């Protein structure tokens, strides 16, 4: 009997990574291969650094101290120990370990940054990062400690320790000493760090970039699910489709507004519930203004994606080493661009969650539109879904606090030498936490929409949303007696974050 061989596509890394490739590597654990041409660029940069070092000139972080100690000149015999001292002294993170997808992203983005050929590291460093990705050796990196300038020094120090056989790492679900994790994966740690290699590993935006990237990937899934579930609510409330008329949106042609209106028209096409309520000439804003509310959210997602695409293919090191041998000191490690993108994303997601809470409130108080109070079978004896809105309101309140920008709250470090930090990692973490809350708010609206449609009959839904409704009905029970819905809400939120709703409908 012949065994079928399934070939898994390998993604080649050459310093030009697409967001689609990054998503496949980070979330689907697709295998990678480093292109020979990129390794040649790495070799050239390393040789250029050694030539510059041989000229005896001071080079920041290579033969000098770091930060406020940069005026201290380091003698040649101590240059390698300087790099090891750096990563040990900077590993001061606290808090819970970062989840595996974010750590995979950090490994990937640090590796891809080195493939720009401007960091001066040896190919052995690059290849070990690639092997750790391949064999799923994930450094244990605490979530707190980065101020988002001079790169993500603290989290990346915890990563760097594993490369030299120190620190801690997860391998096959077990947390181990870093050297043991490498050994079990059949890998060997670096026996020493050459000049600049410790600094190159630490001095970059890879941690805040990975947190923001993972948030953005899931945010797109949540947004698409939210649009489909809003379409269910729209029908349950018998909303008017007149505000979706393309002629209206051509008069205010913001791309996101036009896109969302078009998506809603497609989702609601052939519905037998829309345009059946005649009790008012206009619907509430959370229905009527869906394109104007969610269109800007769509545009933020598009803009953040463009920022991520540039950043993941950038050299975010300092100093940088040009192939011709010149060493330039600068600030490519500074995370301000990511901090602002993360703040914008967090605010946009908060708005998305707020709109879910408002439609949920409409569904629970829609007696004039033919639905029972709180969607209860026997109002009074049963509270129905009354408390869903409480939870949604609590999540909105939390998100409104998290949406306050950390990026405007810079705190100087290193004796004032680093006097303007981005706080980009904090901004990215806030967006990540907001996203988790919004996924639950979308789930809360989904439960109410599923119950509300149950009173009308799913056969009246548009064909596109009928498929969404069927998927939700596999998890959400029909309208009935009071029951504990907390486990259901968790399952729906997980389905949404995994993209289980976005593939249904259109």
List PLM regions with ranges.
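Glycine-rich, flexible loop motifs
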Residues: 6-56, 86-141, 234
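Short, charged/polar low-complexity linear motifs in solvent-exposed/disordered segments
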Residues: 79, 86-87, 172, 421
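FAD-binding core of FAD-dependent oxidoreductases
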Residues: 60-82, 89-112, 142-164, 180, ...
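Polyanion/phosphate-binding surface patch
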Residues: 57, 72, 260-261
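C-terminal auxiliary extensions adjacent to catalytic cores
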Residues: 5-30, 36-41, 45-53, 162-506
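Short, surface-exposed linear patches
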Residues: 81-84, 129-130, 222-225, 418
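Well-ordered mid-protein domain cores that form the structural environment of catalytic cofactors
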Residues: 116-134, 138, 149-153, 161, ...
